[in-house]
Structure formats: C-alpha cells, structure tokens
Amino acid sequence: MSDLESAYRLEYFEEEGFHRRECVSCGAHFWTRDGDRETCGEPPCEDYQFIDNPGFDASYSLTEMRSAMVSYFERAGHDSIDPYPVAANRWRDDVLLTQASIYDFQPHVTSGASPPPANPLVVSQPCIRMQDIDNVGKTGRHTMAFEMLGHHAFNADEGTDYAYDGEVYWKDTAVEHCEGLLADVGVSLDEVTFIEDPWVGGGNAGAAFEVIYRGLELATLVFMSLERDPDGEYEMKDGHTYAEMDRRVVDTGYGVERWTWMSQGTPTVYEAVYPDTIDFLKEQAGIEHTDEEAELVHRASKHAGNLDIDEVADIEDARAGIAAELGVDAERLTELVAPLEDIYAIADHSRVLAYMFGDGIVPSNVGTGYLARMVLRRTKRLVDDIGADVPLDELVDMQADRLGYENRDTIRSIVRSEVEKYGETLERGGRRVEQLAEEYADRGEPVPTDELIELYDSHGIQPGMVADIAADVGATVDAPDDFYSLVAARHDDGDSGAAGGDGGGDDRLADLPETETLYYDDAYGSEFEAVVLDVFEREGEDGDGAFDVVLDQTMFYPEGGGQPADTGVLTGDDHTVDVIDVQERDGVVLHRTTDNPGKGEFVRGQIDTERRRRLMAHHTATHIVVYAARQVLGEHVRQAGAQKGVDSSRIDVTHYERVDRETVKEIERVANEIVRANTSVQCEWPDRHEAEAEYGFDLYQGGIPAGEQIRLVHVDDDVQACGGTHVARTGEIGSIKILNAERVQDGVERLTFAAGAAAVEHVQGQEDDLRAAAEVLDVTPAEVPETAERFFTEWKDRGKTIDDLKEQLAEARASGGGAGEEVDVAGTTAVVQRVDGDMDELQATANALVDGGQVAVVGSGADGAQFVVGVPDGVPVNAGEVVGELAAMVGGGGGGPPDFAQGGGPDAERLDDALSRAADVLGDAASAE
C-alpha cells in the first residue's frame, strides 16, 4: 500500500532549498527553508510568536487585507468572482452552510459536470463553521464566521469528457503563489513551515499542506486528486483506499481574519476584526482592568492556542497549565479571561447571525433555521452573563451594517421576535429542568450530556442554566467542553439523497438514449407519435403486473419539482394502454402502463389535456404566489417546499412570524394583479454561471438542477430555475384564491391555494356552503355571520345557565334533596347516591357533599356505569381504591388520587348492585387504612 510521501516532494521545494523535517514535539512532517528547525511551528508545539510582533510590513484592516490578497491573485492571472451566500443549501442539497470556498463549486464543477465561472479564479468567501463554536473566544484564533480566500484551478486529463480539460496549474505553482503572497506582505519566508496533512472528504482525497507562520496557520493548500476505490493503492486516514482520478483540483483556503490578525499583532484575532464591537461590549459590561491585570491577560493570550477543545482533553486543566506557566492562580486567571472570552464570542456570533439573516435564513426547528436559532440563543445567554444592557438586535445590526446588508430592518425584526420566543420557551422549560434535576439528585448521578442536549433542543435551555437550577436541588451538571459542537452536529447535515424507484439500477436502462422531451417545445401539445425502445416489467402497487415503457420521444411530463406526472394513453395498431404515472431516471422517461404495448412498436400518445392545463396553471401560480409573498412579507421569504395539484396546490415559505388573515389577503391581491396584467411567461436556457451572476441563488426556489445550462422561467419580475410546464401568459390562469394559511413548523408557513378553474370551483363550493347555512338559519347569506355570532353567544349563555342549574341541583342533593343512602365510615357520614346525569353532574354532586364534610359515592347509568368518589380531609379512605373496586363490579376500571377519583364500566345493569355494596367497600377501605 502506497503513502503520499512522494506527492509532497515538489520541484519547487528542491529548487528553493527546502528541507523535510519531523517535528520533535508532535511527529508531523513539514517542509522549511530553515534546516535547523526542530518543530512544526503550530500550537501546542509552539506558542504564538506574532503577538506584539506583527508578521507583516504593514497593519491591515479586514477590508484592506481582503483587497490586498485578491489583488495579488488577480495580478497572478486569476479572475476574481463574487462570493456565494453562507446558506449553501441554496445551490446544494447535501450541506447546509458554506464552510469553505470550494463549497461554491461542489458538486457540479469539481465533478466535471459544469465548467467553473473562471479558471483559475479567486474568491473571498464568507463561511460559517458550526463545529468551531466551542473554541470561539478561547483560543484567540477561532471564529465561527470568517472569510476564506481561495484560489482555485480545475485540471483534467486531455480528451476526457468533462466540462473542462487541460492543465491550468498544480502543486508547485500553488505553493509558489502562496509564498509569493507571503513575500508580498513582508513575511520572512525562512520562518514559514508547510506541514504535510493529507486531506479526505466527500469521497475524494489528496495531499495537503498547512501553512504556518509564527505559530498561526495562515493557509491550507489541498490538492484533490484521488477518489475512493476499494482497489486503490493509497490508504488514507479515514481507513479507505483511494486511486488517482483524471481530474485534479487546487483547493486552497486562506483565513482573511487570521492574516489581518497577523498584520496587527493584537492579543487575539477578535481585537483585529471586531475592535469597535469589543470596546462597546467592554463598556456595557463594565469591564476594567488594572495595569497589572491587563498585562496578565496580555501574556495569557500568547498561550491561548493551547485551549483548542479538539486538541486537549479538558479545558480547565489546560488553563491551569497556562496559569502555572504564568505563575498565577488558575482561578484568578479564569476570573479575568472568562468575561473577555464571552465578549469575543458575542462579537463573532453577532456576525454569524448577520450573515445568516442577511442571506435569508429564518429561525426554525430544522436545518439552517435551527442552527441560526442555536447561535442566537447562545449569544443572548452570553450577553446576559456579562451583564451588558444592550439589545441583541442592536449588536447584530452593527455587524449587518458593516457587512453592507440592505435588509437590516428585517434582520432586527427577526432577532427581536426570536428573543421574545426564547423567553417564553425558557419559562415553559424551567419546570422540566427542575423535574429532571430532582430525578438525578435522587439517583446521586450528574445530569448526563444526552439529557442536556435534549433540553437544549427542546427548550433552548443551556447547560449553565441547567446547572444553576440543578444546584438548588442538589444535582450536578458536567457539560462537555464541546457541548455546542455536539448539538450542531445533530443538525449540521444536508438533505442529501437521490430519488429511488424502479428502473434506477437496470443495466438495460443505462444503455438507452435520453428521451427527447417534447413538452418544453410545446406545453400545449397533447398528441405525439413515438417508437417503443424498451419495456420493463414491474410489479404494480396493487400487486398486479405493470410496465415501464421507454419511448424515443414523449409529450408526457414526468413527476418532478413538485409537479405531478401527466396521465393519458398510448395507442398502437390493435390496442390502447393507459399511462398512469411517468418518472424520469438519468434522462430516460419511464411511462408506467397497465399493459405491454410491445417493444419496437409504433404508438400514438395522448395526454389528459384537462389535467395538463390545470397543472400548468397551478405551477405558474406557484411562482406568482411565492413572488407575491416576498413582496408582502420581505426578501427573506424563500420556498421551503411545494406540491402542485389539479384541484389545489400548496407552497411552504420561510417566515419568522405567523401570517394573519389580512396579510394573506394582501398576498392574494398582489398575486391576482400579476394575473390580470396578463404578463408573458418566458423560458430560456442560459449558462448556469451567467444566470447565477445575474439573478443570484434565489433562482433555486424549487431545487438545484444539474448541467451547464439551466432552464429559467420568467413570470413578471420573478425568475426561477424550473423544469415544469407553464402557461404562456399569466392571464390564462384566470384567478388565484388562497384557501388557507397555516404554520407547518416553526419558521415555515404553508399557503394552500387554487388557480384557474379550480379557484372558481372552490369559490362556488364555499358559496354553496354559505347558502346551505343560510337556509338552516332562515336568513340571507349576508346575514349568516351576524346570525351565527348571535346563536353562538346564546349557546354559550345557555351552557352557563345549565352549568349553574347543575351546581344548584348538586347542592340540593347534597343537602338532603336526593334519595341517597347514608352510612357511617370511621365516624364520618358517607352518602351513596345514584344520579343519572353526565360526569359533570356526578363531579358537582360529589364536590358538594365533600364540601359539606361527607364522603361521596355517586353513580350514574346515563352512559354505561360511572362512579365518582370524594373523600374529605382527615378521613382514612382512599378514593382511588374505592372507585377501582366499584368499577370492577361493572366490568371496568378507574382510579385517581386518595381524595377524589372516578371510573366506570360498560355494564350499567349492575350499577345498583355495585352501589348497594358501596358501604361494605367503604368500611373495608377504612379498616385497611
């Protein structure tokens, strides 16, 4: 089995006089110009060497640093492209957040299916890494929000069938570019080390370097050239084997924040990136240090790199080691640095939230919405912990302003709404924490991590809050240092997966040509002629035989993008078969039929025209309703799911508040304005990158298509990537009627609507219902609402009167107005009485008797046999046991607390017999007590 050692022996290293060394501390191999160097240069092998000793010739702000880095690569022949959103699920279905610049080009470009927007290129990509959340603030270098500047080159062997081929540049040139940039900002190249660190991810692998300077990793250079192969010659650190592939991708990442920090030499990266925010938070929290304290904090910052939770077993032990090295008490050091660590985290998290909400993420209980909510709640707790009297929306707005987002009002509204919801959630969840803490206190065990994560997931209650409540009842909490990383890992996954179904793995299917789709050329066409290329025998849903028919061309639209499949018939020379479903597999359209039309036969296809027209109207209406919702609710609104239908359709949209009736009416009004405008619906097939550059990633409301060209559908000012069938003009829809709005999950509203003929049918149906109600009430349809309200009020009043009369009747029975039997039970009078009323009457009678100091046994035969037993304080009778025995006599059961219980059974004929034995049951119960 081969390793990658040869992959690291570059001609550039040989020409420049590099040496390959092994770190005496960690054992890693690295390359350096300094032949006497013994360590790799990365913490914990070395501390930060640039604090108070900036590593560049000049000091840069984040903006200046980004500009300098991009300019360098532009001069080196790279095209600069605009960054993508932080919500990677806008163009990918396998991940949620953008964590590296290479995410911009996965999977279509890296796989060779699509060309890159430029080659080579450079991009400064905003990223969010949830797995770093617990390190933020502690190590001095970790930020959850950061910009990764990547210079990328996409190479492929000549003659391969990819969207690009030929060699742009590879490892030697990439390393040369890296050193060129370092030299450009004044770095002493003798101090730089290149640590060998093979990279593995997503089924690919390759050699990689970590570029270290004065204790700080400034860049990672990944050379993606391997793919997983059980017969591959390279065994990688994930335990799998890999083989060389015919594509090679230069994937580099330079942390712009870290470069900024290196240029300034501040104690932490946070002072370099968020100076104004940190000063503001220190002032709000009232943090002031003496000169001696400030000097101690400053010295400690140089060792902060040793607090990486991924590298140390216990943070407090690691901090104690730093304190010992500094010659101070560990508790004293923690008192000084912990509030600062919280402030650093608040600054970083506020930027994360600005990125998330600025890019349209809406808080919810799933996906990116959950991650946003988690960060927001943690940030709110940190703000409260440091005692800063500042609204969270103000802190997030400071970052949104700096990042240049135009939807700042919406961002602030989202934050305020979430903070309010969080308060309500904490109030509800506090009772659950008390119960759980008491349970583990009784066991003498700490509250386990799984319970802490569940409390956070369900109620947003953080470990520190659990610890405070648990301490009051004698329970302990020992949350892991990486708690928030564990929580994020539960949710930081995309919805990856491919559609299954019959035919997906059939070898014959793979050999068939792609089906020519006629419905794009003529969405109004209903008839066509075709040749049957193949027929696959299947098992139908009812167990009967079924067939998947492949034609050379088709007018039948296959199910996709939330639009159901067309149905219809295929007619041959001597028979006709029904087409009951249509699916597409890798470009081949499968027509599910009830009979075999015959391979090689010539057939005529006829689709159900009325069904197609209704689906077209509903699909175009879906685009219109989403657009109208964005106009009314805000630009943060995005499609979270859709299902078109013949009679109605539904669209799920992201929004942070409930949509009330007046808002629904406004969305409907805007949608119908577009319909009445009779706007032309246009379709085009532009280059993917050109479309993304012009319209952004809001194109992908209904899914992410593959390919170099994508189909765009223009409806009024709305543009979406879409493969569905549409009307030619919006006026053909006729009208759109929103039937219902409901919250299907937190942060997602579902709008159900009908379009065209279906809208008319729904309105007519509602009118029929209204007229039917009017006839029952003997009023005109216009008078139904007022009459219904009056009847409802009268009904409530009568119900209250009935309840009052029941109480009066119960009191009368209890005071001697009934025919009950009185017996003595342990010196207290017990009344055994039959009252053939409902359960409310039984309970009222029993309560009245108990209030009078009597034991009550009340039975009813109105609905089977039912009992209620009530016992005053101080009487040695257990009501639950008594009612259980009585209920058993009538074939049922019951129970309850000792003072009041109820039960019953189906055998009403034995009710009187059971009541006649109640005195004995009461006597036995009193004796037992």
UniProtKB/Swiss-Prot annotation:
Pfam families to which the protein is assigned, alphabetical: DHHA1, tRNA-synt_2c, tRNA_SAD
Provide the cofactor list for this protein.
Zn(2+)
The Enzyme Commission number assigned here is 6.1.1.7
Record SMART domains: tRNA_SAD
SUPFAM superfamilies in the record, alphabetically?
A: Class II aaRS and biotin synthetases, Putative anticodon-binding domain of alanyl-tRNA synthetase (AlaRS), ThrRS/AlaRS common domain, Translation proteins
Supply one GO molecular-function term. Answer: tRNA binding
Q: Does the keyword Transmembrane helix apply?
A: no
- Catalytic activity reported: tRNA(Ala) + L-alanine + ATP = L-alanyl-tRNA(Ala) + AMP + diphosphate
| GO terms, biological process | alanyl-tRNA aminoacylation
| Function according to Swiss-Prot or TrEMBL | Catalyzes the attachment of alanine to tRNA(Ala) in a two-step reaction: alanine is first activated by ATP to form Ala-AMP and then transferred to the acceptor end of tRNA(Ala). Also edits incorrectly charged Ser-tRNA(Ala) and Gly-tRNA(Ala) via its editing domain.
Q: Which PANTHER family match?
A: ALANINE--TRNA LIGASE, CYTOPLASMIC, ALANYL-TRNA SYNTHETASE
Q: What is known of its domains?
A: Consists of three domains; the N-terminal catalytic domain, the editing domain and the C-terminal C-Ala domain. The editing domain removes incorrectly charged amino acids, while the C-Ala domain, along with tRNA(Ala), serves as a bridge to cooperatively bring together the editing and aminoacylation centers thus stimulating deacylation of misacylated tRNAs.
* HAMAP family referenced in this protein's UniProt entry, alphabetically: Ala_tRNA_synth_A
* Annotated protein name in UniProt: Alanine--tRNA ligase
The scientific name of the source species is Halobacterium salinarum (strain ATCC 700922 / JCM 11081 / NRC-1) (Halobacterium halobium)
